Amino acid sequence: MRVLWVCNIMLPVIAQALSQEYSVREGWLSGILGRYLETENGAELSAADVTDSAASPGGRQQGAETVAALTLGIAFPVAPGREELSQRLQLGSYKKEVACYGFAEDLEHPERYDSAMEARFLQILEDFQPDLVHIFGTEFPHGYACAKVFHRPERTLVGLQGLCISCADNYMADLPENVQNSRTLRDILKKDSIRQQQEKFYQRAENEKKLLLSVGHVTGRTTFDKTISLEINPSLVYHTMNETMRPQFYSGCWEIEKTVPGEIFISQGDYPLKGFHYLLQAMQEILQNCPEAHIKVAGISVLGVNGIKSRIKIPAYGKYLRRLILKNRLEGKVRVLGNLSAEEMKREYLSAQIFVCPSAVENSPNSVAEGQLLGVPVAASRTGGIPDVVKDGVSGLLFEKGNVHELAACVSRILTDKQLAKELSASERETAAKLY
């Protein structure tokens, strides 16, 4: 069987083989590809398991003997000048052949649909001749372009990741009205104010809707993503499929004795939806209970702390975060780490006393999954699909989305109660072993 993956990024193993730069985003894709490449007969590739159900809604899985004959192709956006990339690579310990295809996409403006992508996908489909197309995510317009030209909904599967419509609806994350309406020079020049960012998510949601209406199958893992996808297209066949994380997170174990006292780790904080401002608002209460508390944030910095040039580029949300840091006297208590590799992320998880996911909405965040695999005590918003993967008081602590007092209480409990932290850690590892 020939399966074509359509991805949002060039996966690191492919980029390394082609001597290209690569993104560390969407690490779980590397996880599932790695599992396929390092399995001798390829029988563990979950995307292939729904092929029979494409002809027979109801989800019957096909046998391993068919999956073993799988041939994989992967399409992904590439840098300008490499749009015609079409190359067979030998990857992994078993030197499995993977057909790799590039396509052009304006990743700076994912809200814009470019019909020129359709011609490229037609070339890719004609060359690879897939039996099944598996589109990972609904966030980018290339998914709809591919599904449109393939035009075989019974053989098209979309893996639900984040859902643009829920991101758009929750984007403001309780920001004050004046902050929502504010703009910096950077925002004006890039036409990228907070309001415009939300509108772009609504535009992306339109392409997401078109995609889900043009396919027959989706994979998901939460009540949240199932409800939203079936509201958009009630005729979809929904397949439950948990994710595989990056291999680095399947080894190692959090130990409270090896953590930095008071260290709080979050994986992202560069736009409102991720809720970094909630944590900053909660810090005064947290510091009353744990004076050594401090925050480390992975990902891009929007705080404008790297000289005049970075100050000029600061967005309105970054200015708001800076004001919260000053107002709550958190200078020296917040450190933004930049983009981290999997190994670097793992080190930060293991050195932290707690991982916090304060987002306004998430489906099932990979950052929570990685923390659970390592046994890092987790505190997360009760929102979206998170309650499906975090059982409150067992595999983490939940607080109401946007309730900074509950957030502070959860963080304080874990930072000050070593026995609770150890119990959560053990339960999280048990949960993660079943889910991921």
Annotate each language-model stretch with its function:
Residues L125, R347-A352:
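Short alpha-helical donor nucleotide-sugar binding micro-motif in glycosyltransferases
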Residues A360:
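Aromatic "clamp/platform" in nucleotide-sugar-dependent glycosyltransferases that forms part
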Residues Q419-Y436:
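A charged, aromatic-enriched C-terminal amphipathic alpha-helix characteristic of glycosyltransferases
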Residues P377-A380:
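Short hydrophobic beta-strand element within catalytic cores of glycosyltransferases
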Residues D392-G393, L397-V404, R413-Q419:
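Conserved acidic donor-binding segment of nucleotide-sugar-dependent glycosyltransferases
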Residues L4, E255-K274, L280-L287, I295-A298:
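Conserved donor-binding/catalytic core segment of Leloir-type glycosyltransferases
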Residues K309-N339, E343:
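Nucleotide-activated donor-binding/catalytic signature segment of Leloir-type glycosyltransferases, i.e.
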